[in-house]
Amino acid sequence: MASIPHYDYLVIGGGSGGVASARRAASYGAKTLLIEGKALGGTCVNVGCVPKKVMWNASDLAGRIRQAKEYGFPDVDPKYADNFDWSGFKAKRDAYVKRLNGIYERNLQKEGVEYVFGWATLYKQEGQEFPLVHVKSDDGNTKLYSAKKIMIATGGKPRLPDVPGAEYGIDSDGFFALETQPKRVAVVGGGYIGVELAGVFHGLNSETTLFCRGQTVLRAFDIMIQDTITDYYVKEGINVLKGSGVKKIVKKDNGELLVTYEQDGAEKDITLDSLIWTIGREPLKDTLNLGEFGIKTNKRGYIEVDEYQRSSVDNIYSLGDVCGKVELTPMAIAAGRKLSNRLFGPTEFKNQKQDYTDVPSAVFSHPEVGSIGITEAAAKEQYGEENVKVYTSKFVAMYYAMLEEKAPTAYKLVCAGKDEKVVGLHIVGADSAEILQGFGVAIRMGATKADFDNVVAIHPTSAEELVTMR
């Protein structure tokens, strides 16, 4: 029997977190192998943040085309925005993603990380000192590897409901496979993915319905964000079906979808060209053999890890979406690098770990959302209502002074204690993601309301409102 290739560090999952951790480990001289089942870059690069933002840009540009005449360009017909070349743009977007896949591959090569494509299974064999990983490629070939340390960063996948005809809908991955633009589309789910996709479709002139279980979208965010985005989506003409749930889907002979849903105790029907499920995500761990290997998962199936990313089995680690803790690409990258620093780096990194508090996040809705820290409700529960002071501002950004349409801008600072430490910052409006990045530094450094007040405002900007609120 041929000897089994052995590594210092074996990473299962070639997404952002896995690649970052593998590259960092290799930079310290660790012999490193990375295993990826599909395409390098994971969800973010292939079917997430990157192509989503490209589509958001197109939708945002369509909105600006519709506004151009009011900004002094009389020859720009607003109807130009309705003539979006979906299939042509998809090809261009896919080519961009493929270039990024190549960049990821070259970066691994540059750091000396070996990599193979295939699906990994943890494997125990009598007499083996180190755990084995069995890898099966799509062409059926199999190979065994062993490693001193293994890290699982396989990510997540869209969750699908158990309703009749669910297979006639597509998930958020399927959104990026659409070759033509559906003219009548429904998005099921009021979380950030559903809100983003509904905004893209609406901006590109698809007749858009958004099924929402509650009375507001984005229920994981501060109530100001929930109300502002929900109200504006309704105002803009998105068919937001509050308190609704899809019961079944029937595909007609002509390809149309007849969707039956329940709302306010009554069953109703709607005919669509496409339906997209965005009801949540779950860990991608189907082939891993976690149970037999003794790796504990929680009730939702996510791998349980401690503050140092250690699983319940010695020398097996995990991070990213498969752990279900702050499922954001930059968080997985940061956690992956810190794990490799601790495992393979100099002694000053021996206790390094990722802090999962005060993580800035954005929703690329229309308009954008930015949030860091805790909500107003959470602050009052944590600190006591009498110890929390909230500053809010709702206004129309200067950009809209020339326009009949008035998109909302809403800002909130949640402050706690006598020194009014800013424990939550929540914003809705143009460029919220870009604005939040800088303010995220301030929140992480423990800024107080007085610190905000002592900053000279940049005028005229929307962001100046955050340092002038009283």
Swiss-Prot record:
EC number: 1.8.1.7
Subunit structure: Homodimer.
GO biological process, one term: cellular response to oxidative stress
Chief site of localization: cytoplasm
Stored SUPFAM superfamilies: FAD/NAD(P)-binding domain, FAD/NAD-linked reductases, dimerisation (C-terminal) domain
Species in which this protein is naturally found: Yarrowia lipolytica (strain CLIB 122 / E 150)
Additional facts recorded: The active site is a redox-active disulfide bond.
Binding site for glutathione: S16, R23, Y104, T228, R337, K412
Protein name: Glutathione reductase
Keyword Cell division listed: no
Cysteines paired by S-S bonds: C44-C49
InterPro entries: FAD/NAD-bd_sf (IPR036188), FAD/NAD-binding_dom (IPR023753), FAD/NAD-linked_Rdtase_dimer_sf (IPR016156), Glutathione_Rdtase_euk/bac (IPR006322), GSHR/TRXR-like (IPR046952), Pyr_nuc-diS_OxRdtase (IPR001100), Pyr_nucl-diS_OxRdtase_dimer (IPR004099), Pyr_OxRdtase_I_AS (IPR012999)
Domain of life, per lineage: Eukaryota
Family that this chain belongs to: Belongs to the class-I pyridine nucleotide-disulfide oxidoreductase family.
